A protein has these predicted regions:
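Small/polar, glycine/serine/threonine/aspartate-rich low-complexity segments that form flexible
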Residues: 108-118
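C-terminal outer-membrane beta-barrel translocator/porin domains of Gram-negative envelope proteins
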Residues: 1-93, 97-109
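Outer-membrane beta-barrel "beta-signal"
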Residues: 123-133, 147-159
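Transmembrane beta-barrel architecture of outer-membrane proteins
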Residues: 25-29, 80-82, 119-123, 137, ...
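Conserved active-site loop/cleft motifs that coordinate metal ions or position small ligands
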Residues: 97-100, 136-142
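Short, surface-exposed acidic/glycine-rich loop or hinge patches that mediate macromolecular interfaces
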Residues: 53, 143-147
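Hydrophobic alpha-helical segments
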Residues: 88, 92, 106, 128-136, ...
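Outer-membrane beta-barrel architecture
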Residues: 31-33, 84-86, 125-127, 139-141, ...
């Protein structure tokens, strides 16, 4: 699992009937991840994602708030923002505990327009390094969202 470093990813796509597609729409997605080792045993991870779609996309291409504890495709909009933080405490080289909190917004309630209906989720989890030679971690997370409590089995990092 990452303990330091940053990742920035930006992508834009165009789907067009003139190019053989079934729909006409454009997407833009931005992701920023940052990991900070604050102590020998503690790592802070930060995540910000933005996605937008223009024109007339099918329902499955409309961006949605994607976080542990939030059902997929539940909160969709032409613009979506997600911000999440995860703290990880390493007990030893093979076991760790995580805690996470995140908020999401769709174009109907982006922070600049309305913060009364922020979509938030939080939870805790445990990690075990299953393969030392490949640095593969397996985990179990418990997340609470606005609707349900959910368990997740993770292989690798959740982001």
């Amino acid at each position: 699992m990452p303990s330091r470093g940053r990742l920035f990813d930006l992508s834009a796509t165009r789907n067009d009937e003139a190019l053989g597609g079934d729909y006409n729409y454009t997407t833009l997605e931005m992701k920023f991840l940052s990991f900070h080792q604050l102590h020998e045993r503690f790592v802070l991870g930060l995540r910000v994602e933005y996605a937008m779609v223009e024109d007339d996309p099918p329902f499955y291409a409309v961006p949605w708030v994607s976080m542990r504890g939030i059902p997929a495709l539940r909160y969709q909009g032409k613009q979506v923002v997600v911000a999440e933080a995860e703290g990880r405490f390493n007990f030893n080289e093979n076991w760790a505990a995580v805690g996470f909190y995140g908020r999401g917004w769709t174009d109907t309630n982006l922070p600049a327009t309305d913060t009364e209906q922020d979509i938030e989720a939080y939870g805790v989890g445990a990690r075990w390094r299953a393969l030392k030679s490949q640095d593969v971690w397996v985990g179990l997370d418990f997340a609470r969202g606005p609707e349900d409590d959910v368990y997740y089995i993770q292989v690798g990092h959740a982001w």
